[in-house]
Structures are given as structure tokens and as C-alpha cells.
């Protein structure tokens, strides 16, 4: 399985976070807790690295599901961290009304805007995400100031860049950035994250409909291609399925030059079509990937390059963990 030694991985992440804070001369940290697996793992790591009393953890609901709030409470209790619970729904609604008033006053066609937003829930979803970031910063300052840690993992951040640039992407570090979603799940089991969080469907909960809006369904709707996460058995901590996003990451690692663009790795040249590319990178099918996956990956990577933030440290690299024998790039044979 990709994580060969979960205890060593926990030690590595805890010590690296602790060293980063020590070098910066900053004792405290702030984390936005969503009730999902990534923020749960980060909260457990921060509590171990810095001590529970040095972590400002915030759950900001914007007409969010009760299930996500319950899960946030569960992991805060498990980590021994006090959880700040805020309801930003009224503020969110007020901003929407004021924005519509401003469009109307400026002479825009508000009927068009209403119709457009009815067909694209991500418009309001982007405000939900970006509204939480300044609130998190404010809570951070109110509690004495600290490092604002992110929760992005490799499957979301590497080439999909499945995050909001001014929202969940507006952080100081991403200590999970080198780990796949499956590896984050394995880390969660080892950290004793509550099972309810490990088995919950990954969702950004940005549309106000709970798990009806989940990561995989949004990716499928946007691309027409089944981009999926890996799953693990919480009892054995072993993979029960390998997601196509993780497969793509390991396929990219298998290519000769991992520092060039994904387009050059997959296609050899920007103008090359999918059929030719599939021949060039023919062993993609050995990773369970299709021509459609290659075409979709190129489209996603092209359209999200503006989000990339190379200055946001991941506090280490995947290669360092590979060299230490803590993880492996070899996918489970299922």
C-alpha cells in the first residue's frame, strides 16, 4: 500500500510542522475545519505538533449541513482542541442581495444574472469559500496570530488545482500537499480520526445541499470524465479502490521528466491530439487511464494554471518521503 509506515509518516509531519513554527518564531496555528478528512487530519497533526491550546480551529457554517458541523465537533473533541463555531449565513445572504442591488443600479440585466446563477451553483459556492478565508485570518489575529495552515492534498492540488484561489487556497502552508487522498485516509486511521469522518463522502459543502454536492460528482459534471478518489478500509487501513486522480499522479511520476508541464508529459507537444498522445504515453493504460482521462487532465491543467502558487510551502516533498521508505509510488494491485 502507498503508505508503508504510518507511524513514521505521522512523526515526519509532526516534527516538520513543529520545526517550521520554531524557525518562524510563531507558536500558534489557525485551521479552518470543514468536517472533512483533510482538515481532520491536519487538526490532529497540529494538536500533536503544537499542543491543542495553541491551535485556533474554526468551523464557519454558511447554510452548511448539520452533518459537517457534527463531524467538525467530533474531530475537535478527538484532538482536544476548542472549536469556534460561526454562522455566516446571514452575512452571505446580505452580500448577495447587495451585489444584486449594485448590478441593478449600474444598469446590468439582473434577470440574466439570476438565470445564470440558477444554472451554476458554483457562483454562490465561490463566495462561500472566499468568505471563510478573511474570517479565518481575523480569528487568527484575534487569538494572538499564527500560521494559517491549508488542507490541500496531492489529488486536489497537483494538477487539478481543485480549490478556490482566494478561499481554501488562501493559506500559508499545505503540509499534506505531497500525499494522495488515499494516503491521507491512511494517515487518518493511524491518527485515530473518528470513523464517521473517514467514511463520509468527500464534499466541499459549498452549494448549501450537503453531500448532494460532492467532489467526484462536481468533477464528473464539469469534465464528463470519472475522476475519483481512492478509498481505504478503515478497519485494515488498506486500499479497497485506487482512484483515477491518484492513478494520474503516479503515471506522471513514471514519466522521464516530472518537472515539465503535464501537457508536455502527456502529449509531447501542445498541439498533439489524444489519439497520438495515447500512443506517445502508451503505458497510461497500464495505470487504468483512458484517452478521455488524458484529454481531461490536459484541459483541467490548462484552465487552472492561474491558481498555482509555488510560494506556498508544503513543508517537505514526496521524494523525501519516498527516499525515507515511508511511502511508495507503487499502486496496490486490486
Model regions and ranges:
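ATP/NTP-dependent adenylation/nucleotidyl-transfer catalytic domains that generate, transfer
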Residues: 1-31, 45, 53-56, 63-64, ...
Amino acid at each position: 500500500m502507498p503508505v508503508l509506515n504510518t507511524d513514521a509518516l505521522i512523526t515526519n509531519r509532526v516534527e516538520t510542522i513543529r520545526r517550521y513554527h520554531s524557525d518562524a518564531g510563531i507558536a500558534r496555528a489557525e485551521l479552518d475545519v470543514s468536517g472533512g478528512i483533510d482538515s481532520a487530519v491536519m487538526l490532529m497533526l497540529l494538536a500533536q505538533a503544537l499542543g491543542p491550546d495553541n491551535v485556533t480551529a474554526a468551523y464557519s457554517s454558511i447554510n452548511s449541513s448539520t452533518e459537517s458541523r457534527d463531524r467538525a465537533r467530533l474531530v475537535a473533541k478527538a484532538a482536544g482542541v476548542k472549536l469556534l463555531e460561526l454562522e455566516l449565513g446571514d452575512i452571505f445572504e446580505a452580500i448577495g442581495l447587495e451585489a444584486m442591488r449594485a448590478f441593478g443600479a449600474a444598469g446590468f440585466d439582473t434577470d440574466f444574472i439570476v438565470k445564470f446563477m440558477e444554472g451554476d451553483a458554483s457562483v454562490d459556492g465561490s463566495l462561500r469559500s472566499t468568505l471563510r478565508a478573511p474570517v479565518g485570518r481575523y480569528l487568527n489575529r484575534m487569538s494572538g496570530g499564527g500560521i494559517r495552515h491549508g488542507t490541500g492534498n496531492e489529488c486536489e492540488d497537483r494538477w487539478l488545482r481543485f480549490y478556490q484561489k482566494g478561499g481554501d487556497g488562501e493559506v500559508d502552508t499545505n503540509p499534506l500537499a505531497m500525499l494522495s487522498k488515499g494516503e491521507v485516509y491512511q494517515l487518518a486511521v493511524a491518527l485515530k480520526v473518528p470513523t464517521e469522518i473517514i467514511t463520509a463522502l468527500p464534499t466541499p459543502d459549498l452549494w448549501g445541499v450537503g453531500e448532494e454536492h460532492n467532489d467526484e460528482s462536481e468533477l464528473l459534471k464539469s469534465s464528463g470524465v470519472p475522476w475519483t478518489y481512492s478509498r481505504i478500509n478503515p478497519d485494515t487501513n488498506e486500499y479497497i479502490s485506487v482512484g483515477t486522480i491518484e492513478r494520474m499522479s503516479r503515471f506522471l511520476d513514471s514519466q522521464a521528466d516530472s518537472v515539465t508541464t503535464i501537457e508536455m508529459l502527456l502529449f509531447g507537444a501542445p498541439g498533439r491530439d489524444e489519439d497520438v498522445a495515447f500512443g506517445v504515453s502508451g503505458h497510461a493504460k497500464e495505470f487504468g487511464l483512458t484517452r478521455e482521462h488524458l484529454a481531461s487532465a490536459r484541459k483541467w491543467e490548462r484552465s487552472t494554471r492561474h491558481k498555482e502558487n509555488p510560494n506556498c510551502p508544503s513543508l517537505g516533498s514526496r521524494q523525501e518521503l519516498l527516499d525515507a521508505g515511508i511511502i511508495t509510488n507503487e499502486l496496490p494491485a486490486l
